[in-house]
Structures are given as C-alpha cells and as structure tokens.
C-alpha cells in the first residue's frame, strides 16, 4: 500500500511538473510573439521620427501663414515614406500601418507641388490623415492630434498651445486636442 501511494504521489508530481513546464513554455512563446510584434512596430515608429519632424515643420510654417520650408520638407517626406517598412508590423494595428507609407508618400508629393498658401493647406489636410492615424496608434511622446471643426480636419502638432495650420493667424487657436499626450484644447 505504501509503495502504491508513493508511486501515485510521484505520478502526480510528474504531471504537475509537466503542466508547469507547458504553462511556462506557453507564456514564453506568447511573450516572444508579443516582443516580435512590438519590435516591428517599434522599428516602424523609429523610421517615422524624421517624417514626423518634417511634418511638424510644415505645420509650424502653415500656422504662421508661411510657405517657408514647406516644399523642402514635403519632398523629404516623399523620400522617407518610400523607405518605410510596414511589412514587419504585426498585431492589432498591422492593417492600419500597412497603408501609412503609400498614403504619406502620395499626400507629400501633392503638397510638394502645391502653389500658394491655400492649396498647401488643402494638401496638408491629406498629409495629416495618415499622420494622425499613426500618432493615434503609436502615441509618440509630446505629440498631440488636434481637430478643427471649422476645417473639418485633424492635424498633428507638438504638445502645447493649439496652432491651427489651416487658418493661421485668422483662427490660430481654433482646435481641440483629441489624441496624444493631452486631451485638453480650445474649441470654437
């Protein structure tokens, strides 16, 4: 009877050990999958940083009623967007990331050819769509998505006071922060 109880205990311990090992392997496998998905998105987000810089410079110029640097920065976005690799992104937002490079490249190309402040602002609306989507997904630090109900359009800007690129000095603070680090804004 003692031998049987010892064998039963030994078998139970082996089963418990096997379950524990399988659970740990499943957890490690899951974490490896998550890490791979995050590294693809992280790599994409790193590639987006110079694009974000050029985009923010365009927004600053337009909010100051200026075209200075707009064409140069738009051309830079065209080149940088062509080199983006969204194929490595997997997980929840993979389908959204997939379209960002082509949408950025097309909108930036149009903006680089825009003549005059009003046409540049209209083209900037199209460029802002994939940028706002990306910022909403990746949440880069100190960057907000702002919406202007007067323009019926969003844009991305550095965290701080709203500076409307679609109306400039006429309605510089028209907009509401709807995403990013802050959710407070000034709305008309």
Predicted regions and their residues:
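Bacterial N-terminal signal peptides that target proteins for export
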Residues: 4-22, 29-30
């Amino acid at each position: 009877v003692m031998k049987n109880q010892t064998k039963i205990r030994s078998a139970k311990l082996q089963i418990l050990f096997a379950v524990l090992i399988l659970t740990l392997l499943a957890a490690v496998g899951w974490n490896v999958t998550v890490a791979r998905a995050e590294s693809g998105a992280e790599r994409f987000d790193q590639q987006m940083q110079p694009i974000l810089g050029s985009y923010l410079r365009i927004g600053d110029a337009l909010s100051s009623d200026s075209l200075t640097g707009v064409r140069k920065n738009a051309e830079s976005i065209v080149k940088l967007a062509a080199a983006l690799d969204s194929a490595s992104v997997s997980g929840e937002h993979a389908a959204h990331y997939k379209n960002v490079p082509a949408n950025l490249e097309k909108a930036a190309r149009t903006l680089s050819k825009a003549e005059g402040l009003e046409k540049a602002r209209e083209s900037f609306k199209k460029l802002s769509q994939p940028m706002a989507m990306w910022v909403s997904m990746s949440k880069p630090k100190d960057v907000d998505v702002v919406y202007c109900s007067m323009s019926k359009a969003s844009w991305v800007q550095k965290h701080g006071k709203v500076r409307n690129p679609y109306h400039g000095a006429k309605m510089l603070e028209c907009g509401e922060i709807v995403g990013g680090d802050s959710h407070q804004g000034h709305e008309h």
